[in-house]
Amino acid sequence: MAPHFTVIRDITPDSAIPRGAVVAMGNFDGVHLGHRAVIAAALEMGRAQGRPALALTFEPHPRRFFSPNTPQFRLTDERAKLRLLAGTGLAGAVVMTFDKARAGTTAQDFIHHDLIGRLGIGGIAVGYDFHFGKGRVGSPSLLVNEAPRLGIEVDVQPHVDIDERPVSSSAIRIALAEGQIDEATTMLGAPWFITGEVIHGEKRGRDLGYPTANIRLDANCGLKHGIYAVRVGRGSERLDGVASFGRRQTFDNGAPLLEIFLFDFKGDLYGQALDCAFIGFIREELKFDGLEALIRQMDDDSARARVLLAAAPDAFPKLGTVD
């Protein structure tokens, strides 16, 4: 049985925070390989010191606070991020609310009041480019310089490169927007996934022999419209399928929707929350002259999806349980 993952929202006098813990600090959007290097450093530091290791992260994402009217494509919402963090071996996460007060806290106050005073950290791991505090004055070098006086260990992780390019959340967003699923998967260390509740549709897919589980995604989802090979998680069960994301051009040019056809599955999924991992990009959206042409293409899409999925039989993100 996996150890319990504790989530602490903000820090109050009543918070059950294990003082002296080692923290991995960051926004962790996507929990990609660069983030995982920071987490691994915190876990190793914790083992060496005999201390638990926690994530320290912020919600909403600071970009959302500073630019509330700018569309933000997040790789992971708060719950998805926490589920990924729970799968890394960390003991828990402290989620700090990023609001006006937090944005106005100086880096020195954050270090002394929050990290040392409230959390009493024994060590901290950060990425090379992580900044914090008012005006983003707080930096890895500031933590390193303060460490001897504070009596804590600081680990600064360099960037992780793939094909001589640094891994970043921005690079992953670009890859997803271009339908480069393999590239995004490599940078993430696992397939990108979304979670959503199955809603009722117009049941046109059923009439075509392809009944779908329909999920509305965030309006700011930047995934390229098209057809994908997907693997769906329903609890511990894994179901393979093919999915269409975008506007249903053949019918009504409606709002973007994820429509998933699951192979070899019969059952009612309405109202259930599914995790959908994107394994491969098959093609862009097309508009068909008639239903026969559409069905032939759907048959071909399904065959191609089965090949992609068979080549990656274990591809799925490692997710922990979050209360």
Label the predicted regions.
Residues 139, 144-246, 322-323:
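Glycine-rich, Lys/Arg-enriched anion-binding loops that position phosphate/diphosphate groups
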Residues 18-25, 33-92:
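Active-site rim/loop-helix segments in enzyme catalytic domains that contact anionic ligands
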Residues 32, 85, 124, 184, ...:
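Residue-level signal for inorganic ion chemistry
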Residues 1-22:
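Positively charged, low-complexity intrinsically disordered leader regions
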Residues 64-128, 132-150:
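N-terminal Rossmann-like or analogous alpha/beta NTP/dinucleotide-binding catalytic cores
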Residues 58, 98, 159:
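Cofactor-binding loop segments of dinucleotide-utilizing enzymes, especially the Rossmann-like FAD-
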Residues 201-323:
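Phosphate/ribose-recognition catalytic cores of enzymes acting on nucleotide-derived substrates
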